[in-house]
Structures are given as structure tokens and as C-alpha cells.
A protein has these predicted regions:
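Tubulin/FtsZ superfamily GTPase core signature
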Residues: 1-314
């Protein structure tokens, strides 16, 4: 098998010129679209992931109605910063609902964790060697472009993340069985975010393996569930830079390549659960930059996130 990353290309895309002008469907068309829709969970990791998921909610609301799609599509966003993103739908600002779609996994007491690391087995095993090199600050406004802070935030808030993922997956699985009785349709999972920062880049692989582990609870239906990843590269952030943009991206892609090609993931989580898997975390992974096929750069990260949201909708 060849190197996984050698087969990947930054996905070119046309600007979503009609993103803000997509008309609402009539009721018959909306119902037909819903009946064709496979149960889908879209997970946003970090601020970029939250933007994508919010824009997707705007599209779903505009095209299918404010509530009609929620039995078939679940949206979750996990971020370490308390930021609100809005998308337009029928002249109305659409936002993710706090504590139902949008979850804050920040407010991590890093100094206290450092002092009590001996009693925190899951965190010590994953991050014990690197924690002393990190700034002893309470994470209240993002992961400081530090990937270990992203993973630490997920582990510190593990119960919240695990429970919300499980609730969404079981809702979609149960709903699908109730509607059609056909378990072979399975569930589509999309995990999206940037590879350049701390939260998304530090959590996307663990999120995928947590979802894989939760799939096993579905029995035979798990065979028909698929995970797709979407990661944004530094070029998707025109005019924005940071000292860790390139190192974070390189580290994230190296870890992704290792797990996709060689597989083999083992980690203990704070509830004592050990996930040991030989499966690749994703069935498919797309990397997205900020340049289209003509070599023109997208205007800003918001435009790129809108493009990704439209791709997910279509």
C-alpha cells in the first residue's frame, strides 16, 4: 500500500456564489429531499469546525425548514473558545444552540492538572511528558494554537464529548430503524476542522476513534457507518498566520498518515475505557486549501468554510 498522503490533493472548489441566495424548497421537494437523506452526523472541531457546522445549519434551514431536517441530521461543535458564529437563512441569523449543538470544552485548569497529574492516569499517559513544557494557564479562550492543549481539553471534558457523540449516534440509528426498518443504510459521520490550530488539530483523530468505538454498540449496523474527515490547511487562512500553523499541520498530517496507513491506535480515556483499534480512523479524508483551480485565493476563511458547508449539503 502506498503512502496515504501521496494520494491526497488539496481539494479545489468553485466559489459558492449562490451560498447566500439558495432558495427555500417547496414542501413537496423538501419532503422528497429528506426521504433521500441518509442519517448524518456532522462534528465540528475547534473554531473552524464550528464555522462550517453553523453555515451548514444555515443551508439546511434555508432549504429544508428550521426543524424538518433535525431527525435526519445532527450537528455538534466542540470548541475551547466561547465564540458565536452566525449564518443567514431567510433573512434570519442562524446560530448553533448552546449545550445542544455547540459545546464549550475550554475552561481547563491546566495548572491544577499539572499539580495533580499523578492521579489523572488518562492524561498522564497521553500528555505527561509534554505538560511541563506548556504554559500553566487556564484555557478560557482557545487552545493557544497548541495541539496538546486541544487534546487535553477533550480528555478533561471527555464525559461531555462522549455522551453527546453517543446520544447523537443512537438518535440517528434509532430514528432510521423506526422510519424504514433498514439498518443497512447506516450513518454518515463527517468530522471537520482546521489542521493549523490547537483544538481541531489536537482532537480530530481522537474524535474519529471515539466514534468508531461507539459504532461497535450498533451491532451489524456498524458495518454500514462511514467516517469522512475534512481538514483545512494554512492556505485556507489568507492574511492570517501564526508560529504554529505549519508545525501543527505537519504534525497532524504525519499522525493521520500513520493511522490511515499503518493503523494501530490505543489510548486510555478518563472513564477507564481503553480504545484499541486496528481500523483507520477515517474511511476518507479530504484536505482543503484556499486556492481554486485557477490559482486564485479565496477571500477569507469564512468563504472557505461556506464552501465546505455547501459541499457537505450537496
Amino acid at each position: 500500500m502506498g503512502d496515504f498522503l501521496s494520494d491526497l490533493q488539496a481539494s479545489p472548489a468553485e466559489p459558492p456564489a449562490e451560498f447566500t441566495a439558495l432558495p427555500a424548497m417547496d414542501s413537496a421537494a423538501a419532503l422528497a429531499a429528506l426521504n433521500r437523506l441518509r442519517p448524518t452526523l456532522v462534528i465540528g472541531a475547534g473554531g473552524t469546525g464550528q464555522q462550517i457546522v453553523t453555515y451548514l445549519k444555515g443551508l439546511l434551514t434555508r432549504r429544508l425548514g428550521p426543524k424538518e431536517w433535525q431527525g435526519r441530521v445532527r450537528l455538534l461543535a466542540f470548541d475551547t473558545a466561547e465564540e458565536t458564529v452566525s449564518a443567514k437563512a431567510a433573512d434570519t441569523d442562524v446560530q448553533l444552540e448552546p449545550n445542544a449543538e455547540q459545546f464549550n470544552i475550554g475552561n481547563v485548569p491546566v495548572p491544577s492538572i499539572m499539580q495533580n497529574i499523578d492521579g489523572l492516569d488518562a492524561i498522564r499517559e497521553r500528555l505527561g511528558a509534554i505538560l511541563p513544557t506548556l504554559p500553566p494557564v487556564v484555557l478560557r479562550s482557545g487552545a493557544k494554537q497548541l495541539r496538546p492543549f486541544g487534546l487535553l481539553s477533550l480528555l478533561w471534558n471527555y464525559k461531555l464529548v462522549h455522551d453527546e457523540l453517543r446520544r447523537a449516534i443512537w438518535l440517528l440509528a434509532g430514528r432510521q430503524q423506526h422510519v424504514t426498518g433498514n439498518q443497512e443504510q447506516g450513518i454518515n459521520i463527517f468530522i471537520c476542522g482546521s489542521l493549523v490550530g490547537g483544538t481541531g488539530s489536537g482532537t480530530f483523530l481522537d474524535l474519529a476513534h471515539l466514534v468508531r468505538a461507539l459504532f461497535t454498540e450498533l451491532g451489524s449496523q456498524a458495518e454500514f457507518c462511514h467516517i469522512t474527515g475534512i481538514g483545512l490547511l494554512p492556505q485556507a487562512f489568507p492574511g492570517i498566520s501564526g508560529p504554529n500553523f505549519l508545525p501543527n499541520t505537519a504534525a497532524a498530517l504525519q499522525e493521520l498518515n500513520h493511522l490511515m496507513v499503518k493503523s494501530g491506535f490505543k489510548a486510555r480515556f478518563p472513564d477507564g475505557r481503553v480504545i484499541q483499534s486496528q481500523e483507520a480512523p477515517f474511511n476518507l479524508f479530504h484536505i482543503i486549501d484556499g486556492v481554486d483551480e485557477r490559482g486564485q485565493t479565496w477571500s477569507d476563511i469564512g468563504a472557505v468554510c461556506q464552501m465546505v458547508a455547501e459541499g457537505l449539503y450537496l
